[in-house]
Regions:
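C-terminal catalytic lobe of FAD-dependent flavoproteins
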Residues: 295-381
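Active-site substrate-recognition segment that forms the wall
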Residues: 19-23, 81-83, 199-326
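Flavin (FAD/FMN) cofactor-binding and adjacent substrate-gating region
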Residues: 91-159, 163-166, 172-174, 313
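Short hydrophobic core segments
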Residues: 6-8, 31, 187-200, 346
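Beta1/beta-strand and adjacent pyrophosphate-binding region of the FAD-binding site
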Residues: 1-13, 29
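Conserved beta-strand-loop-beta-strand element in the redox core of flavoprotein oxidoreductases
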Residues: 171-188
């Protein structure tokens, strides 16, 4: 039986959930405060890393391999290339690298262990601690995030039973009745509602839930590599961990994109979403950190800097699914890692919205029971 689903949000979780619902024959309305896709969505950027290896976590590693396969299927569905399979390199202590490569193999992935010498020989344009090794994955790489979102919308526009409502902020959600009120007074009625608005979630959730979400602000540098290093960078995989104390990571320039640099040291907790400009302090901090990692790197490489926001569930530091009542849910926090798992998350959410038992995807926040806004411990707050 066809359901009427309202999806609030214009980022990757909202759009892929809409895709999954449409594929199942349901009627879907997507509404967002900005354009669709929303250029201020957490997921709107040049690129994101897709890697399988999650050290010492075989369950999540297996889930990431499934996500890899689903992204390949989505390229075929949308008839759009947005997944550059350049591999992924995770720099680790030698013992952890050996364990990681073995775990990936056991999970059905393809990876090899690199020694410190092999790492230095293969990537001379990276300065990695000489005592570290690495795991190099094959079934991994870079998702061209903006292209992903555009492909979702392009596909949805050609489907029956889909309505996209842009530039209409949502002021209230009544999950029990399936109604969503817009800023212009219009009320959308449906059988199920999903709120997936990333860092704006706190404004649409009960205070007791909103108070358990942490807002993060991350600074990012976008760079042009020197011409004499272009060949080396063209053969560089995505690097989710460079093995530094500060948690530095990078995305190589692929398909006309910039080299993206950032670090855990450039992520901080903030109270509100304000501007997106990178303060000179944070830019200099990142420039100094990467000056020790990339030979020859300096401010002249940097062509742009920006800040982005995301939310996490304070209790776990990860994502959060909230049951709003009726057939209403909120994917209220991404935890900073949701993009690569978005196809799996969308499948689980679509199942819940349309009355099916949710697919088990290997992610605890989605496989377990959601946080219930009507639970006594929340209702009493």
């Amino acid at each position: 039986m066809s359901a009427r689903v309202t999806v609030v949000g214009g980022g990757v979780i909202a759009l892929l959930t809409a895709v999954e619902c449409v594929l199942e024959g349901h009627t879907v309305t997507v509404v967002d405060q900005g354009p669709i896709p929303h250029s201020r969505a957490t997921s709107f950027d040049q690129h994101r890393i897709l890697r399988a290896l999650h050290p010492a976590d075989p369950r999540t590693t297996e889930a990431a391999l499934r996500a890899h396969r689903r992204w390949v299927e989505l390229e075929e569905l949308f008839l759009t290339r947005f997944y550059e399979q350049v591999g992924a390199l995770t720099v680790l202590p030698p013992a952890a690298a050996a364990d990681g490569a073995a775990m990936l193999g056991d999970a059905g992935g393809s990876a090899r262990e690199l020694t410190a010498a092999g790492l230095s020989d293969r990537y001379p344009h990276l300065h990695v601690d000489g005592g570290l090794g690495a795991v190099l994955e094959d079934e991994a790489g870079v998702l061209l995030a903006e292209r992903v979102l555009a492909a979702c919308v392009g596909w949805l526009k050609w489907q029956r039973g889909i309505e996209l409502i842009e530039h209409r902020a949502v002021t209230a959600v009544d999950a029990e009745s399936g109604s969503v009120r817009l800023v212009d007074g219009r009320v959308l009625h449906g059988d199920a509602v999903l709120v997936a608005v990333g860092p704006w979630s706190r404004g649409l959730l009960p205070q007791a839930v909103a108070e358990r979400l942490t807002l993060h602000r991350q600074s990012l540098l976008y760079c042009r590599v020197p011409r004499n290093q272009a060949r080396a960078w063209a053969a560089t995989p995505a690097i989710p961990a460079l093995g530094t104390r500060g948690g530095a990571w990078l995305i190589p320039p692929v398909a006309g994109t910039a080299l993206k640099l950032t670090s855990a040291t450039a992520c901080r907790v903030v109270d509100d979403i304000t501007d997106y400009a990178t303060d000179p302090y944070w830019q200099r901090k990142l420039e100094k950190e990467f000056g020790d990692i990339l030979p020859g790197f300096g401010p002249a490489w940097v062509t742009a800097a920006k800040d982005a926001y995301y939310t996490s569930f304070t209790d776990t530091g990860g994502p959060l699914l909230v049951a709003l009542g009726g057939a209403g849910y909120a994917y209220a926090a991404c935890g900073g890692t949701s993009f690569k798992f978005a196809p799996l998350i969308a499948r689980s959410l679509a199942d819940r919205l349309t009355g099916r038992s949710p697919s088990l995807i290997g992610l605890g926040a989605l496989d377990g029971p959601p946080l219930d806004v009507h639970a006594p411990q929340l209702a009493g707050l």
